[in-house]
Structures are given as C-alpha cells and as structure tokens.
From Swiss-Prot:
Active in presence of diverse metals including Fe(2+), Zn(2+) and Mn(2+). Binds two metal cations in two adjacent alpha and beta metal-binding pockets. The activity is the highest with Fe(2+) bound to the 2 metal-binding sites. Activity is low with Zn(2+) and Mn(2+). Its EC number is 3.1.4.-. It is found in: Nucleus; Cytoplasm. This is Lariat debranching enzyme. Residues 242-277 are annotated as: Disordered. The modification Phosphoserine is found at S269. A divalent metal cation 2 binds at D40, N85, H179, H231. Its main location: nucleus.
Amino acid sequence: MTKLRIAVQGCCHGQLNQIYKEVSRIHAKTPIDLLIILGDFQSIRDGQDFKSIAIPPKYQRLGDFISYYNNEIEAPVPTIFIGGNHESMRHLMLLPHGGYVAKNIFYMGYSNVIWFKGIRIGSLSGIWKEWDFNKQRPDWNDLENNNWKANIRNLYHVRISDIAPLFMIKHRIDIMLSHDWPNGVVYHGDTKHLLKLKPFFEQDIKEGKLGSPVTWQLLRDLRPQWWLSAHLHVRFMASIKHNKRSHEPPNKSTSKTKKNNNEIDLDLSSDEDERSGIMNCQEENEYDSKYGETRFLALDKCLPRRRWLEILEIEPDTSHASWKDENHRMFWDPEFINNLVICQKNKNLLSNKPFNSVNWIELSQSNREEGRDIDWENYAIPAYTLDIQKDEVRQTKAFISKFMT
C-alpha cells in the first residue's frame, strides 16, 4: 500500500536549521515527501520586519530564515507552513493567498486548501480572538507608514474572511492545519496527563476556553482525517469520533473571553524526551465521504527534550492529478478557489450577518458548476523561479488576476 511520509513540526520560532537537520537525518534513512510547519515560522527578512512581529526587543534576532530567503541554503524537502501569533506580518501580509518565501518553502496564506501527491491539505493561519473576528485587517501601506506598533498584537488574529471559505468545503479534507487548538479536542484525549505537564491550563479547560471555538466548529463540520496544531508548546493527541453532522461546541462553558492586552508566549519545559514517531492512518473511504474519526496531534516547539517533530504516513488518492504529476507540483484546490470568489462577492453579507446564522452549504452552491470537468493544469501552483520570494506583490497579483477577477 502506497503511503506518503509527512514530517510535522510544531512551532518553529526561527529554528529552521535545527528542524532541517533532523528532517535530513530521517530523510536519509527513509525519504520524506513533505514537511509541514505549524506556525510561529518567523520569516524575518531584515531588521525592518521586527516592527511587525510580537517579540520583545531583547529576544529579537534574525534567525535562520534569512539564509533561505537569500538562497544561501536550500530546504532539503518541500515545505509548507502556516502563520501563528509570532510572525513577521510585514512580510506575510504581502502574501494573503500564500506564495513562495524561499525555494522549496511555501506559505499557505491566511487560509488555503492545496493538493500535493494525492493528499488534500487545508489550513488556517493565526489564532482566535473574538473581539477581532469580524474586523477587517488594516491596509499594509497604512501600517507601513506609521501603525505597525499599534496593531502588532491583532494582525495575526483570525478574521471571518479567513475561515468562511473553509466552512463552505463540501468534500473531504485529509489534513487540516491550524496554529491554535480547536477548543473541544482537549476533552477527547488524556487531559490528566496534559495537566501534569501544563497545570496552568486547568481553569481554561474547565471553562471550555483552551483554544478556538470556531475551529472546533470547523473540525466537526469538515471531519478531516488529521487535524494538526501547535501554539501551546506541548505534545497532545486526541481522537474525535463523528457520529452525526454536528456544529455543537464542547459541553463546557463558552462564555465570552475578556480581552487580554498582554498576551504571553507559553514557555514551560516538559520532562519528555525529544524523539520522532511514526503514525499510520487507517484505510480511507471514497473521495466524497468525510472521515468517521479525526485524529488530533499537537506538537511542541523546537527545543531540547521536547517532542516537536513527528512523521505521519498517509495513504494518498492515487487517482488524483496531483499524484500522477511527474513534476510533483502542488495544486490549488478548485473548490476552495470557488469559495474564495463567492465570499468576495458576498463580503457585505458575511460582515453584517451573525456568523452562526450563515448557511454555508447554500452559499457554497451559488455560481457552482457541479460535476464539471476540472483542468488541473489551470490549478497547478507555478514552479519556483529564482528570487520570486522577493517579489511578494507579484505573486499575489498573479493569483488575484488568475482566479479573483
């Protein structure tokens, strides 16, 4: 049985060299098809980017990324990553729909769905904060003039425009990525062990506040095979069984959270050994069905004696164009692209209507040509060209021109 080997990394915090050293060690023994990094990537290109990243001045350092950005080092395996809450937003805001940040390294944008070698991967960058969910992000040019500092702790908060196209997805997702945890997963794993490692989570767990309520709703709706997260700097596994289509939150209090202007980075060490593991996925259902069980995995950040990297082995759809592609290209997802276009046309409705009252299935059917033949060549993500990562605006304009106009 054919399976893809996918390396999964928790928070990066600029430690690309260490991550790729471990990936290369494993890759030399048994090849790895793809590396996924689950946020706090910190794509800092120069000193100017520090004005847009939530890192105290005494901890600011360029990190390893600049060597990849300047083509001094090449990533050893294809890499995709999502944004977290410690990102160079001055950089990533130029790529709202994703794009190359270096050779072999692709940012997924605020949200996305792509295909790679027969695996369908969805993503959502940032973290949940209720008070910013219905707000628009400021314009990059306005921020560049004088406002980065004033907005440094809200630019990475998830917006309704980020997540709406994901709620409209009708066909199954193999792997879903988010930086913070869906807030219901904690009740489906070994909570006692989690509290041994992170006792200060107890109150949030009791109140149903450890994580994002909106991604928990999305998990119950999409029912992916895997949901992967980071953010809380601890390894945690859970298994969520899906008996019925459900949008219900976990059976805990979901009262509104008071705004905290002093968000801190959780950073308590655990006594667990740093090691890699392999997990085998179960045999799949047919393409259009959703999975009866979602396996959740959260990983730590890249530090000694932490569990920050693991290998998943996943069975691909060998009938899909992305599997058959001889150049092993990534492909944008037609359903997600269609949803983006619909959301753009209905942005006034989405901004004025309560989120939980939107009929996502009905909305997704507007202007949809069900059963149409797909020209997958039209959705192939262009191959990397030298220094394209340094022309972020051109990458974004090309995407908008191709799909959004």
